[in-house]
Amino acid sequence: MLLRLCIIATLLVSHCVAVSTSPATRDTNGEGLLVQTSSGPIQGFFNQTAPDVRQWLGVPFAEPPVGDLRFSSPVKKQPNGTVNAFALPSSCIQQTSNSSTIYTTYETGFLISGGDSEDCLYLSIWAPRIENIQSQQRPLPVLLYIPGGGFTSGGEASLYKIPDKWVQRTQSHIVVIMNYRVNVFGFPNAEGLSEPNVGLLDQRMAVEWVAANIANFGGDPARIALWGQSAGAASVTAYSYGYPEDPIVAALIADSGAPNIVDNEDYAHTNFTFLASLVGCDGLSSTEELSCMRNVSARKLQTALSTYSGSPSISFTPAVDNKTFFANWTERAITGKVAKIPLITGSNTNEGAGFVSFTPAGPSKSTLFEITESIIACPVAEEVKNRNLANLTTYRYQYAGNFTNISPLPWFGAYHSAELPILFGTHYEYGGPSTQYEWDVSYAMQALWLSFVEDPTRGPVRLAVGNVPANPTNESYFAWPAFEQGSDDLLVFAEGGKVMQLVGAGRIDDYC
């Protein structure tokens, strides 16, 4: 399982692309743009790309994790004047790679933009106009998104994952996206530290901040869904085990990931000590080593980590601490040590295409299938099985879309992350126009995700929209059935010309 994360970490790397988020309107007269929070007053804006969406980009939820706070648990942000939240924040320090993948050659819209920095613990918020919220007579549900990146890279500044157009269209939900520390800065696992997984603690602090403050933005703190993809999905599901009695959120969504994709066996803390030796902090006690590493420049650490090519490789991902990350997820599930809240989870039919070095012809179908199953699909299936053992409500899907503006070469198919432009509603923006079928799939998936957070107890439902029925049998109402082992309750999107259809999960599970 360590190989799974090594592959994800190597291929989902950071490269810079341009994102423009310049504010067109900074208004404080009744528009609900200046919001009081525990971090101080936050000034937002409108712009022309989504004129009915209030945006706050780069809202601090923790103090900058620099100096003595490097490698330490996050510290709540203290107010220090008005924050002008007008631009997406820098991502946390990235571990980079020169690998050639479909993301670096064709689909750069998934890559982060705007550079990276240690001062990175920010989140961004997209909400409808205040008068549109007030007309709905209750606060809005909230999707709180954790980006992926193999726990070594990633952040909120990614073209395909900017939700302003989605919020503009629905005017019925709020989206929040967070940054968190990654690689050695987020998962140092140093002998001198009591907390090896401070990146996961960053995520928890972001959840706490949103729960405490989202009402002031028009959101409902009782209707927050924690949503993530890839490493973000692993974080979401791990979160449910780490906070079984106090999850804060009401629902979970995990796209293409589960906690068992991570197997960090560095119990002796050797990775941190080895990295320390590369930057001049060798031969020290654990306390001295930690102090020395806190005084090395962030760029020097980044360069040492990103350029080391020896064997065995070194990586920094969540380590077992039996507080935020556990050695036996099945045992946690069957003993009830998991949050009793519902989950949507699933995988894509051709995840493997995102984890191979790019060639125009691509690997064989059998190779891609084996990678898909081993790295993502089977770990997700195992997590679903664990939740079934714990009698937890789980809705399971598979995404099969192969749209040319997202997958320009036929062998790409529904690769790792390909569902995200469909869900965020950005599928038409960067690779050419979308077909009506693609729009129909997007609307269906968005409707189900949103209905889930609107009422997690009821579960995801969908009404017919225009000429598009709610499901393939032309009914006007579709209720997604909770998944049970051996049932035909796997909801497949975008396959065989159908928007969605229920099938058996043997197409995945029989090969695990």
Swiss-Prot record:
Active site (record annotation): S230 (acyl-ester intermediate), E351 (charge relay system), H416 (charge relay system)
Keyword Disulfide bond on entry: yes
Originating organism: Aspergillus niger
PROSITE patterns for the chain: CARBOXYLESTERASE_B_1, CARBOXYLESTERASE_B_2
Family: Belongs to the type-B carboxylesterase/lipase family.
Secretion signal span: 1-18
Name the record gives this protein: Chlorogenic acid esterase
Pfam families found in the cross-reference section: COesterase
Superkingdom field: Eukaryota
Entry annotated with the keyword Iron: no
Enzyme Commission number(s) from the entry: 3.1.1.42
Residue pairs linked by disulfide bridges in the UniProt entry: C92-C120, C281-C292
Catalysed reaction equations from the record: chlorogenate + H2O = L-quinate + (E)-caffeate + H(+)
UniProt subcellular location: Secreted
Temperature dependence: Optimum temperature is 60 degrees Celsius.
Function: Extracellular chlorogenic acid esterase that releases caffeic acid from chlorogenic acid (CGA) contained in natural substrates such as apple marc and coffee pulp. Shows no activity towards 5-O-p-coumaroyl quinic acid, another quinic ester derivative, and rosmarinic acid, another caffeic ester derivative.
Keywords, sorted A to Z: Disulfide bond, Glycoprotein, Hydrolase, Secreted, Signal
Any one cellular-component term (Gene Ontology): extracellular region
One MF term in the entry's GO annotations: chlorogenate hydrolase activity
Residues carrying covalently attached carbohydrate according to the record: N47, N80, N98, N271, N295, N322, N328, N391, N402, N474
Alphabetized Gene3D superfamilies for the sequence: alpha/beta hydrolase
pH dependence, entry free text: Optimum pH is 6.0.
Chief location category: secreted
